[in-house]
Amino acid sequence: YKTTRLSDEECKRLLKLLTNVMNNEKPYTNPNLKSSDLAALIGTKSHSLSFLFNQYMKKTFYDYVNEYRVEEFKRLVNETDISRYTLTALSEKCGFSSRASFFRHFKASTGITPSEYIKNNLR
């Protein structure tokens, strides 16, 4: 087993592809998303993506994906009529597989609970 090393240029290229896929295809809405799925979407190997996350971006795959999920939740709150959804249903639409995981990541990311965010952002 050899360690994958990627140049800064290669990391920048992969990150650009990854950002494009995340923003346009929203694979993070799949609660069962694996890093191998993301690697396939951007046409790279899993260990290259792992290097990108751990060495270049200094974060885990799950932290990266959950950042997008939290942002998606915020977008839904701001752009749609959420009154007919429960918090659990909204979190599932964003790709979280459990309410507990959603609350934990949301609070870690924003410093407030999802309910507080909704209260502060509903017009």
Predicted regions span which residues?
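Membrane-proximal linker segments that couple transmembrane helices to downstream signaling/catalytic modules
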Residues: 1-89, 93, 105-108, 115-116, ...
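The DNA-contacting recognition helix of HTH DNA-binding domains
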Residues: 46, 98-100
